[in-house]
């Protein structure tokens, strides 16, 4: 249930936030004169080089419009139609991409794995691979992990190492949906390479939209062989921007002075403040560990409905039926305090409808 309200900033999604100053300034600066189209411009080259510098490895970089395209096209490049993709049962590629991974891979089957708090248990990979090996069953080829997960948790470097080892054992490729990768890196306090290629990740979908950009994700192939003809996939699927500089230039602004990490750190800090405030309310139950920029809570139904009526927006269909409260790069302590004040007032009043 979503009701439009009067609050300037919301907790429904980091997609609600506007464009951060660094991305906006870089986009403005790129809007000078003419530049070659379809990615043959210096902005795209510079953004790609900055990503290579960030991960400290030569890699192939492609810019696409959104996360669904990034995930589905990169997964399609890792497998054939008779293969299967293994992911957590709550993964975005399973629950929120309208079958795009299957569509762009011409029918690759998605098989679901278990694991606590939205994270894949490496043993579940082993069980799924061993389950059937006959010609009548789609052959497992790719494992997809979400970092940070759909439940706001984060894989540690050690957990990713274990998954990477399991992938190597069974000759599986490893894909990372990193729509909130920046928040995961900020939470872990490690270098980006530690939770990507050093752990065995073949391709990362590096999110920009949820971290202060207007739109755009970067598909980063650490296994460069797998990027062969990926540019054709982008073109065929309508993801090759003719004026590519306007898709890639904001990445320059985000990466050149560390804004991508600062904004993620801020969003995480606001979520931590929100979590701490919620823990002081005995009527509120937190559902999952808060590790990145989201907090999942169980609100009494009358309170939830009255919060909607007061103009607060948040999702209540993600996870186990609880409410997801998401902080963004521009969330302030005042926003959190205002939300908590309304919540406290309704809890004291018993949330009786007016």
State each model region's role:
Residues 2-310, 316-331, 339-354:
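Conserved PLP-enzyme active-site core in the AAT-like
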Residues 335:
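Ligand-binding grooves and catalytic loops that recognize ribose/phosphate and carbohydrate rings
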């Amino acid at each position: 249930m979503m009701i439009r309200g009067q609050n300037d900033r919301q907790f429904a999604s980091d997609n609600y936030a506007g464009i951060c100053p660094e991305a906006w300034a870089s986009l403005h600066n790129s809007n000078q004169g003419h530049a070659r189209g379809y990615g043959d411009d210096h902005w795209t080259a510079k953004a790609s080089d900055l990503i290579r510098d960030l991960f400290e490895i030569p890699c192939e970089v492609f810019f696409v419009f959104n996360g669904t395209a990034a995930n589905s096209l990169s997964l399609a490049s890792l497998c054939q139609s008779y293969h299967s993709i293994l992911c957590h049962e709550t993964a975005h590629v399973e629950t929120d991409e309208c079958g795009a991974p299957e569509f762009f891979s011409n029918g690759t089957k998605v098989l679901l794995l278990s694991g606590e708090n939205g994270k894949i248990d490496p043993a579940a990979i082993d069980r799924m691979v061993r389950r059937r090996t006959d010609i009548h069953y789609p052959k497992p080829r790719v494992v997809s992990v979400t970092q940070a997960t759909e439940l706001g948790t984060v894989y540690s470097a050690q957990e990713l190492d274990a998954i990477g080892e399991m992938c190597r054992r069974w000759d599986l490729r490893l894909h990372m949906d990193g729509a909130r990768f920046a928040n995961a890196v900020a939470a872990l306090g490690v270098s980006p390479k530690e939770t990507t290629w050093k752990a065995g990740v073949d391709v990362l979908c590096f999110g920009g939209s949820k971290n202060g950009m207007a739109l755009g994700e970067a598909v980063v192939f650490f296994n460069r062989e797998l990027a062969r003809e990926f540019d054709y996939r982008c073109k065929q699927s309508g993801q090759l921007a003719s004026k590519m500089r306007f898709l890639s230039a904001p990445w320059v602004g985000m990466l050149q002075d560390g804004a991508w990490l600062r904004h993620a750190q801020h969003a995480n800090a606001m979520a931590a403040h929100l979590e701490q405030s919620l823990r002081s309310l005995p009527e509120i139950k937190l559902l999952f560990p808060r590790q990145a920029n989201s907090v999942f809570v169980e609100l009494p139904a009358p309170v939830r409905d009255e919060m909607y009526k007061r103009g607060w927006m948040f999702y209540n269909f993600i996870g186990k039926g609880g409410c997801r409260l998401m902080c963004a790069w521009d969330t302030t302590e005042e926003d959190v305090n205002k939300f908590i004040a309304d919540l406290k007032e309704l809890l004291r009043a018993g949330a009786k409808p007016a």
